[in-house]
């Protein structure tokens, strides 16, 4: 007989490791599982130097958070351990974050953290401790499939859904992960935290980017990849120089404010060319793209990705976490994966994720996704756009 986590055996004989960040979500997850009778162990990861971030409001995984996680564990009566993952986090997340900006991309470090640190290394640690599952406080859900595997679905609370940041979870990882808050709203989570008398019940939610102590991500990039802060030209779609900038890392595709160019119409950042250190600007209409090329595909839907991509498939995609899924068609074009958006999308930037869903609303199933390398329009293949723009997008 399966317990509430879809595992064999009673809760009392089921060990679960909970990733405790010190926030209300993971703390409530631990308290809920403990109340249900599971053998719960709390683990908090020390991911970076907490000196400057310890007292910054909204920081995640900072020094105070470690103390909060320890206090919660003591309150609910579970063992709690702090693991030093700073070197792993720097290599897997911070270094890649800085390098991505240096290449003119807009990275999403939370995805890499979930994939490479929390769900890979921490899951291994949980299994070494004899745990049958690793539980987190993410707002996403999973469902048991007829063959015993797990399917990831969007959270019941659409405003809190974090599936965009979890698309890179592998099928093997997903089979061992549990998300107890996936069918709850944030309000329900806080109410549970109050009911459990948790000291973090009213704590503010964490904000990205956790490892930027000052809140200025360019400080990290300037220190680690100074070439990304070298000056260059701001040009229009025809290549005409309109002005100058102090580093491409200060810009992202879709940006309007802070360009520093006076023009008769609003100008937006349309592309970044790291090789020439050019920031390419244009009207808003130039932001809309309907063809996206992807790398590093992760597929967690039915069947294999090779079969799906070879035959082509209609699905729904997100290119930003705050946007609703848009209808699109997935296919292979030669040796690379393409997604064609039926209605197009604005501000598609290399480095961001393109996440696949099987439905546009509700608790849609997450099918996987990939990272964006290029965004264009079908007409670009005919050479109708400025060469520098085509090379950069």
Swiss-Prot record:
Residues 160-162 are annotated as: Interaction with tRNA. The keyword Transferase applies. One of its GO terms (molecular function) is tRNA-uridine 2-sulfurtransferase activity. Keywords: ATP-binding, Cytoplasm, Disulfide bond, Nucleotide-binding, RNA-binding, Transferase, tRNA processing, tRNA-binding. GO terms for biological process: tRNA wobble position uridine thiolation. It catalyses: S-sulfanyl-L-cysteinyl-[protein] + uridine(34) in tRNA + AH2 + ATP = 2-thiouridine(34) in tRNA + L-cysteinyl-[protein] + A + AMP + diphosphate + H(+). The active site is at 113 (nucleophile), 210 (cysteine persulfide intermediate). It comes from the Bacteria. The keyword ATP-binding applies. This is tRNA-specific 2-thiouridylase MnmA. The gene is mnmA.
